[in-house]
Amino acid sequence: MTDLRHYDVIVSPAITEKSTLVSENNQVVFNVAKQATKPEIKAAVEALFGVKVTAVNTLLRKGKTKRFRGFVGKQKDVKKAVVTLAEGQTIDVSTGL
């Protein structure tokens, strides 16, 4: 798989309060493409960051219905991946991809 395809799999790091809490357990959270599979996510993280991945857990957050000035809209669905790294491995997501 080429580097360009790896960048299509990993959309962005998810920087939230919960993701900073799980970072203490050698885990990193990424927003990923909806059609990405766990093996693709594992291969992309290992290739782009040069780390060993032990597990990948995914979740699909459904978009919320929101109102703006009386008009009803919907946020997009987001797929997230919680990537568990091997012992002693780290990724600094604050510097960007």
UniProtKB/Swiss-Prot annotation:
Highest taxon of source: Bacteria
GO terms for MF: rRNA binding; structural constituent of ribosome
CC annotations in GO: ribonucleoprotein complex; ribosome
One GO term of the biological process aspect: translation
Swiss-Prot/TrEMBL keywords: Ribonucleoprotein, Ribosomal protein, RNA-binding, rRNA-binding
Similarity-based family: Belongs to the universal ribosomal protein uL23 family.
Entry-linked NCBIfam families: PRK05738.1-3, PRK05738.1-5, PRK05738.2-4
Quaternary assembly: Part of the 50S ribosomal subunit. Contacts protein L29, and trigger factor when it is bound to the ribosome.
Function: One of the early assembly proteins it binds 23S rRNA. One of the proteins that surrounds the polypeptide exit tunnel on the outside of the ribosome. Forms the main docking site for trigger factor binding to the ribosome.
Protein name: Large ribosomal subunit protein uL23
